[in-house]
Every structure is written in structure tokens, then in C-alpha cells.
């Protein structure tokens, strides 16, 4: 009977668990990486899309009441800065529901950025005074209402499944009380012998 090296076996199990956990984190950000197209799989992750058949982030979303189309994306791909944050927030707050009525409560808003933009985002929402002016204006974004979520899983990185993916400049506003992005773990990772 052969003795097993149990330390190595458990180390392999731990590494498999870490790999499975990372894959779940990676998969959770793929709607952002692939949100500007209607491709069904992004970086090896299958995405299910519902609604109007357009990309998740589109400038021409239709409303079910037949009203004017709406945009939840910049048509020019504006970079993150204080001024463009204000532009994005105004656009988000002026969105209408499918019946044409205003959105009543957005809740806390998260600014989701690739790690390359994290410093700028944290300066904009964390400074006590406005970071882009010299007149000591108050910074209206540092009241805790805006949360920064930064991750390397959004950045443009080569060597991922499917090649280079993500963007070093794309940023997103996510309102917690609006329609939530849903992550369904259809088949949890399991270990079998």
C-alpha cells in the first residue's frame, strides 16, 4: 500500500478552491467587460441578456411604453474625472422607468472602475475640497453617498481566456436600488474522486 503525501493533496485541494473562487469573481465582472456588445460569451463566461436585445450599455434602449429611447452609456466614451462624474450622475438621475415615470430612489451609487482609474476615483470622492480647482470649493462627492469599487478584472489585460479583454478607461455607475445585476451560480464547484 502506498502512503499518500496528504500535505500535497490538501495543498492541491486548496489551490482548486482558490481557482474556483477566482473564477466566480472573474465571471461577476464580465457583464461590464462585455456590456457594450451583444456577444453571448465574454472571456469564456456565458451571459444571458433580457429586454430589448441591445447591448447592456447602449445609447438607444427602447422603452416598453413606446416613449423616446434612452441611453445608459456615453456615446463618446468619456474618461473618468470630476466633471464627467457629474455628467454621468445627471444622466443616471434623469433616466425614466419603462412607463415613462421618473426613477424614485436610486439609493447608494457605486462608481465601478478598473484598478488603473482607482486613484482618480478615490481622489474625486474622498477629498474634502474639490480636487480640480484652486478656490477651495467644497467637494459634494465626499459625503459617503458614492462608493468606489476598483478591480483588475475590468482592466485591459492580455493572457486571459479569449485574449485581451476589458478596458483601462471604461467606468460605470451602479445604483443599488435600481434593477440589480444578477449572478446565478448554476453549478457550484465540487470535488470528485
Each language-model region and where it sits:
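Glycine-rich, mobile lid/loop segments that gate access to catalytic sites or pores
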Residues: 24-66
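Sequence/fold signature of self-assembling virion shell proteins
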Residues: 51-98, 105-110, 115-193
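Catalytic micro-motifs at enzyme active sites that drive phosphoryl/nucleotidyl and oxygen chemistry
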Residues: 3, 97-100
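Long, contiguous amphipathic alpha-helices that act as assembly "spine/axial" helices in icosahedral shell
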Residues: 1-40, 111
Amino acid at each position: 500500500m502506498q502512503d499518500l503525501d496528504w500535505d500535497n493533496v490538501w495543498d492541491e485541494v486548496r489551490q482548486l478552491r482558490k481557482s474556483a473562487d477566482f473564477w466566480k469573481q472573474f465571471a461577476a465582472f464580465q457583464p461590464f467587460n462585455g456590456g457594450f456588445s451583444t456577444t453571448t460569451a465574454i472571456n469564456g463566461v456565458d451571459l444571458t441578456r433580457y429586454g430589448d436585445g441591445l447591448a447592456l450599455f447602449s445609447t438607444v434602449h427602447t422603452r416598453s411604453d413606446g416613449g423616446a429611447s434612452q441611453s445608459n452609456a456615453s456615446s463618446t466614451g468619456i474618461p473618468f474625472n470630476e466633471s464627467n462624474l457629474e455628467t454621468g450622475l445627471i444622466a443616471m438621475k434623469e433616466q425614466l422607468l419603462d412607463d415613462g415615470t421618473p426613477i424614485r430612489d436610486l439609493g447608494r451609487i457605486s462608481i465601478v472602475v478598473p484598478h488603473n482609474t482607482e486613484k482618480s476615483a478615490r481622489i474625486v470622492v474622498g477629498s474634502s475640497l474639490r480636487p480640480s480647482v484652486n478656490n477651495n470649493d467644497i467637494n459634494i462627492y465626499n459625503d459617503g453617498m458614492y462608493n468606489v469599487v476598483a478591480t483588475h478584472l475590468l482592466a485591459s489585460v492580455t493572457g486571459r481566456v479569449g485574449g485581451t479583454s476589458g478596458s483601462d478607461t471604461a467606468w460605470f455607475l451602479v445604483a443599488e436600488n435600481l434593477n440589480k445585476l444578477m449572478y446565478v451560480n448554476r453549478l457550484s464547484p465540487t470535488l470528485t474522486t
